Amino acid sequence: MTTLLISDLHLHTGQPDITRGFLDYLERDARHADTLYLLGDIFEAWIGDDYLGDLERQVIEALRRLSDAGTQLYFMHGNRDFLVGEDFAAAAGATLLDDPCLATLGRQTVLLMHGDSLCTGDEEYMKFRAMARDPEWQAQILALPIEQRLELAKSLRMQSSDANTQKADAIMDVTPAEVEAIMREHGVSTLIHGHTHRPAVHEFTLDGQPAQRIVLGDWRPGRGWEVRVEDDAPPRLREFAFQARA
């Protein structure tokens, strides 16, 4: 049994090589997997299931082919694609996950997260996150005309980029105390997340027992990241190359 976990592709029309690499990944690697977890920020922006451009349609169709072929698909919202809804999930053949979420990988129960909720030192972002995950706020946004939502998404991305250039690196990384607290709350020794774009395996001690935090990397032209779990083997973080094509 093979399980794959990926995040932070940030798919958009300006990076067609990454989109092509992802579509190839679905046909090549994921087709041989039993389960694929998409842990957020698969899309750079998502303004609602009622707006589908060519890129979005391509991805949905590829995911549907994968799910129809027998691979179980799970989708967790990120800080960029938090408006992905049930219509997307139904079209893609995926199941939407809560964040955080417990999952059994091999013989081990692990905690899955996108990772943005762990960055509690970034108080400005945490305020935005609380607002953006509010169902009432989301309903108000989804009620806006598509053109207005496109402009809002563009504005939010620019604001985020400008703000991040002025923040210290430590603020945008996870808060260790928050990591320990949520792992303790869910009774796990392994946490897998993305968001920070800092791929690594962090080994530490939690309440006297060995623990680990596996951080997925973001995809870039020609390079991707995954966590792969084969049968009962422990999760393995892996960087891989793909052919970048326009």
From Swiss-Prot:
Q: Which cofactor does it need?
A: Mn(2+)
Annotated Mn(2+) 1 binding sites:
8, 10, 41, 197
Which species is listed as the source? Chromohalobacter salexigens (strain ATCC BAA-138 / DSM 3043 / CIP 106854 / NCIMB 13768 / 1H11)
Q: What name appears for this protein in its UniProt entry?
A: UDP-2,3-diacylglucosamine hydrolase
Question: What keyword terms does UniProt attach to this protein?
Answer: Cell inner membrane, Cell membrane, Hydrolase, Lipid A biosynthesis, Lipid biosynthesis, Lipid metabolism, Manganese, Membrane, Metal-binding
Q: Which family does it belong to?
A: Belongs to the LpxH family.
Instruction: Tell me which PANTHER family the record gives.
Output: UDP-2,3-DIACYLGLUCOSAMINE HYDROLASE, UDP-2,3-DIACYLGLUCOSAMINE HYDROLASE-RELATED
Pathway the protein takes part in: Glycolipid biosynthesis; lipid IV(A) biosynthesis; lipid IV(A) from (3R)-3-hydroxytetradecanoyl-[acyl-carrier-protein] and UDP-N-acetyl-alpha-D-glucosamine: step 4/6
**EC identifiers of the protein:** 3.6.1.54
